[in-house]
Amino acid sequence: MREESRSRKRKHIPVDIEEVEVRSKYFKKNERTVELVKENKINKDLQNYGGVNIDWIKALKPIEYFEWIESRTCDDPRTWGRPITKEEMINDSGAKVPESFLPIYNRVRLMRSKVKTPVDAMGCSMIPVLVSNKCGIPSEKVDPKNFRLQFLIGTMLSAQTRDERMAQAALNITEYCLNTLKIAEGITLDGLLKIDEPVLANLIRCVSFYTRKANFIKRTAQLLVDNFDSDIPYDIEGILSLPGVGPKMGYLTLQKGWGLIAGICVDVHVHRLCKMWNWVDPIKCKTAEHTRKELQVWLPHSLWYEINTVLVGFGQLICMARGKRCDLCLANDVCNARNEKLIESSKFHQLEDKEDIEKVYSHWLDTVTNGITTERHKKK
């Protein structure tokens, strides 16, 4: 998967809106007033953000465990309809928040509260439960340790792969474990160790780099047994020691596996949008890791988890890398990267009655929910 504004009048829907220094050729000293986040300090101060008791989590029963994870990493779109206030944007570093953040982000959250996107239906966080349910394994029967493993495998499969294909690959492995290996729990460490690597590669052929990923998964399974008490690591160093696992996957796995919000998960959508809106330095932030470190300087910890889900879904359906729908975007009156010609020709711009505009937008929301993302797709 690849990847100035001028004043004008138009109709729109109103919206109420440590000491390890990061060294890189892209990050030179004294070029910005805000220093990049210090990784050691974040880990040292985790208790201030509600650090977790790993032994306590391991002892939780399935229902208790999933309630705990849900309380830490809520993906309920209904919570995104409420605008974030300036008071909520206070951060520990005292760093200045980009002026465009709240006007744009509040509108993006509102849009995300209305539509269901691929990441909501088939993203990594949904895969273990969705696949288990599809295979007849009820949520309350999913062992937390297996859930954590299945989530990790899902993230490894997801690299440079669409959510739908990743979900299919996870389903293929699960069905093989159930039907061929006769493992009632689906994907387990024992099952992954028993599957021959060529067989595993064939099961996940629908994802990109499936041969390499099969090798990574086999090696990871053995490492978890040898070095991590047959469970996933609970710190970023341990997670990153696994083959094929990078920071994006690592922080997301810590979030959904242990409820530990130790860093922001920055994928291609988050990286692209944050640079486009100048929330991070678009010149210095050449990689997702650069973007993550800059974001963590000023973004309040309370938003570290949700920003990934919010922006990924927005980037999948409304502000794609190619074919942006500025004509349908509620943030097109505050966005610095809007397409003026597209907006001028839109139905929103032509309509004079706000009620009609809301009606058109509601109809568009219905089509998106039903899986149709653009008028171009409908014509095809």
UniProtKB/Swiss-Prot annotation:
Q: Which cofactor does it need?
A: [4Fe-4S] cluster
Record bears the keyword Nucleus: yes
Subcellular location(s) per record: Nucleus
Q: Which domain of life is it from?
A: Eukaryota
Expression induction: Constitutively expressed.
Gene3D superfamilies xref list:
Helix-hairpin-Helix base-excision DNA repair enzymes (C-terminal), Hypothetical protein, domain 2
GO MF annotation terms: 4 iron, 4 sulfur cluster binding; class I DNA-(apurinic or apyrimidinic site) endonuclease activity; DNA binding; DNA-(apurinic or apyrimidinic site) endonuclease activity; metal ion binding; oxidized pyrimidine nucleobase lesion DNA N-glycosylase activity
Q: What does this protein do?
A: Bifunctional DNA N-glycosylase with associated apurinic/apyrimidinic (AP) lyase function that catalyzes the first step in base excision repair (BER), the primary repair pathway for the repair of oxidative DNA damage. The DNA N-glycosylase activity releases the damaged DNA base from DNA by cleaving the N-glycosidic bond, leaving an AP site. The AP-lyase activity cleaves the phosphodiester bond 3' to the AP site by a beta-elimination. Primarily recognizes and repairs oxidative base damage of pyrimidines, but also purine-derived lesions, alkylation damage as well as abasic sites.
| Description of how the protein assembles with itself and partners | Interacts with MLH1.
The molecule here is called: Endonuclease III homolog 2
